[in-house]
């Protein structure tokens, strides 16, 4: 990701950061840059925290996806969410239809994965989920 002035300002203004990370090697490079910038921002007096890392575009058929998750787990075991967002056609289609995945394919694998992430996030924060009807 680009770490220009806007991104750096957003990081400095935030209390907590969740980093969505594609299961690709370039994603790991971006992660190391963001973590470094967060450290620099904290040194300047900000209290920003890395809340978590959400693995996205996971393809269980490839060693690459599994290797990237393993690498993140090795260095960020506490921050890594156990929920993993898979690479699916329906997740890719939803934005092109101007819809969320819950509008486009509410019972699909992608929607269920995001629901799992939401549940995990809320559990970490000790917040009771409110059902979407």
Which role does the model predict for each range below?
Residues 125-133:
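C-terminal helical "lid" subdomain and adjoining coupling/linker elements of P-loop NTPases
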Residues 41, 121-124:
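Hydrophobic helix-cap positions at the C-terminus of alpha-helices
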Residues 35, 115-118:
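A cross-family signal for key residues in well-ordered alpha-helices
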């Amino acid at each position: 990701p680009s770490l220009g002035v806007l991104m750096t300002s957003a990081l400095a203004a935030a209390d907590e950061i969740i980093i969505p990370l594609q299961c690709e090697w370039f994603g790991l490079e971006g992660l190391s840059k963001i973590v470094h910038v967060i450290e620099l921002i904290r040194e300047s007096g900000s209290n920003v925290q890395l809340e978590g890392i959400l693995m996205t575009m996971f393809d269980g058929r490839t060693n690459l996806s599994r290797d990237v998750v393993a690498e993140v787990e090795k260095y960020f075991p506490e921050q890594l969410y156990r929920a993993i967002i898979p690479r699916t056609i329906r997740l890719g289609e939803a934005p092109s239809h101007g819809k969320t995945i819950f509008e486009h394919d509410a019972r699909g694998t992608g929607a269920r994965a995001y629901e799992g992430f939401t549940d995990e996030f809320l559990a970490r924060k000790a917040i009771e989920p409110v059902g979407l009807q």
